[in-house]
């Protein structure tokens, strides 16, 4: 159910942004609003508090965001509150931002390495991904995990390329085990 709510509201915001030709502006505003929600857990507690009326919640959110973000984004937040969907707000924002990336043909890559990767290597990885995928740009996320021993693991969406030494050793071990049994 939660994913359906996120999709429904995220699509509505995306369509509104396209219709008003304000996709870039709304994208930046949603990123900023999302950051406010992520950094202020008290705001989430306030919105989820059962004894605070929807009207009080709407007034509070309007007080925070009106004049700081567009009327479209403020109005969207008000609708979410009036419909009682504030507990889905993070999922709605994530869906909207994913939809924007899809529209702009921007991929998101998660790269795991055993050691820190230099800036030059990061550029080479990004260039290789751009050359071998349909994306025109990438949001790159790097993580160091010494347990993979060496190589890289690259995840883009639901696709994973695992060229880690750990994976290769596991495969070799399985193959040797099969030979011993055969």
UniProtKB/Swiss-Prot annotation:
Keywords: ATP synthesis, Cell membrane, CF(1), Hydrogen ion transport, Ion transport, Membrane, Transport. SUPFAM superfamilies: N-terminal domain of the delta subunit of the F1F0-ATP synthase (SSF47928). It is a peripheral membrane protein. It comes from the Bacteria. InterPro entries: ATP_synth_OSCP/delta_N_sf, ATPase_OSCP/dsu. Gene3D superfamilies: N-terminal domain of the delta subunit of the F1F0-ATP synthase. GO terms for cellular component: plasma membrane; proton-transporting ATP synthase complex. One of its GO terms (molecular function) is proton-transporting ATP synthase activity, rotational mechanism. It holds the Pfam family OSCP. It is found in: Cell membrane. F-type ATPases have 2 components, F(1) - the catalytic core - and F(0) - the membrane proton channel. F(1) has five subunits: alpha(3), beta(3), gamma(1), delta(1), epsilon(1). F(0) has three main subunits: a(1), b(2) and c(10-14). The alpha and beta chains form an alternating ring which encloses part of the gamma chain. F(1) is attached to F(0) by a central stalk formed by the gamma and epsilon chains, while a peripheral stalk is formed by the delta and b chains. Belongs to the ATPase delta chain family. NCBIfam families: ATP_synt_delta, PRK05758.2-4. PANTHER family: ATP SYNTHASE DELTA CHAIN. F(1)F(0) ATP synthase produces ATP from ADP in the presence of a proton or sodium gradient. F-type ATPases consist of two structural domains, F(1) containing the extramembraneous catalytic core and F(0) containing the membrane proton channel, linked together by a central stalk and a peripheral stalk. During catalysis, ATP synthesis in the catalytic domain of F(1) is coupled via a rotary mechanism of the central stalk subunits to proton translocation. This is ATP synthase subunit delta. It comes from Lachnoclostridium phytofermentans (strain ATCC 700394 / DSM 18823 / ISDg). The gene is atpH.
